[in-house]
Swiss-Prot record:
Name the record gives this protein: Serine/threonine-protein phosphatase beta isoform
EC class (word): hydrolase
Lineage: Eukaryota, Metazoa, Ecdysozoa, Arthropoda, Hexapoda
Active site, UniProt feature: 124
Organism: Drosophila melanogaster
Binding site for Mn(2+) 1: 63, 65, 91
Positions with a binding annotation for Mn(2+) 2: 91, 123, 172, 247
Cofactor needs: Mn(2+)
Amino acid sequence: MGDFDLNVDSLIQRLLEMRSCRTGKQVQMTEAEVRGLCLKSREIFLQQPILLELEAPLIICGDIHGQYTDLLRLFEYGGFPPAANYLFLGDYVDRGKQSLETICLLLAYKIKYPENFFLLRGNHECASINRIYGFYDECKRRYNVKLWKTFTDCFNCLPVAAIIDEKIFCCHGGLSPDLQGMEQIRRLMRPTDVPDTGLLCDLLWSDPDKDVQGWGENDRGVSFTFGVDVVSKFLNRHELDLICRAHQVVEDGYEFFARRQLVTLFSAPNYCGEFDNAGGMMTVDDTLMCSFQILKPSEKKAKYLYSGMNSSRPTTPQRSAPMLATNKKK
């Protein structure tokens, strides 16, 4: 980065001006600014633990996938930082048409409010995945491949899990048969790519499945599925109350599993312009009461650059109907 002085406030201001503009308008950011965001946020990620220990109150959000206008809607609903503390569960890039604006605003907020704004790694924060599903092409079209590699270096340093007040375990994908204790997560070294198997892979890729006991094969061709019994054993062993994860489209933006011992959050409404799903976020108050805020899909369906690739996307396992928004978990 040399002597480049990153003006985060100016960047945030430009990124937020999109609220009054037409959907999909690109934000003008110099290559030096974007590179500066990656390098500075990478430093902060490495200064903080790979397994975050956070305190409520905070708002948790699931997949965003480059749907920048919807990210702004989430902040309008929950409050723009620092009005609220946030934890995002990964998958910031790919599929939507504004991955750059999305990840740049999130990294800028991380730099501006490092102790109040937290980002976990999703399976799309990985070079082999976002090389294919849109982010590489967006970087190459608007900047260059070198900048995409700078993002890769940043993503390789993201934390992979969080525990809120010793009771709520958060990650992008789910549990792992290799996970016996939290110290195993703390021992994961960064920077690191996402391997094809093992603990880090599973935290970012696994899925719950009501039809499985124990561990099962995953239709994605990566990692595993896990049953209700696995969830219950994990929570009991670690004296936890809830697993909060993302990684799957759910119709109402959130969906419970295993007698409300696990919740899936998905925060990209009308995903890829093809699904008629809502986007959800979960507010955890200081007593650990959880409530859900829902973004309905917009009336106008934006055109998504990579929606055509959705046909090759692994299908989400069918699961039971979600609980009503009035339900709360203590």
